[in-house]
Amino acid sequence: FDLGMLVKKVLAGL
């Protein structure tokens, strides 16, 4: 699991 990918996905969702 890559936390960085999750962060980028969340930021993209914003």
Curated annotation (Swiss-Prot):
Keywords: Amidation, Membrane, Secreted, Target cell membrane, Target membrane. Expressed by the venom gland. The keyword tRNA-binding does not apply. Its main location: secreted. The modification Leucine amide is found at residue 14. Belongs to the MCD family. Mastoparan subfamily. This is Eumenine mastoparan-EM4.
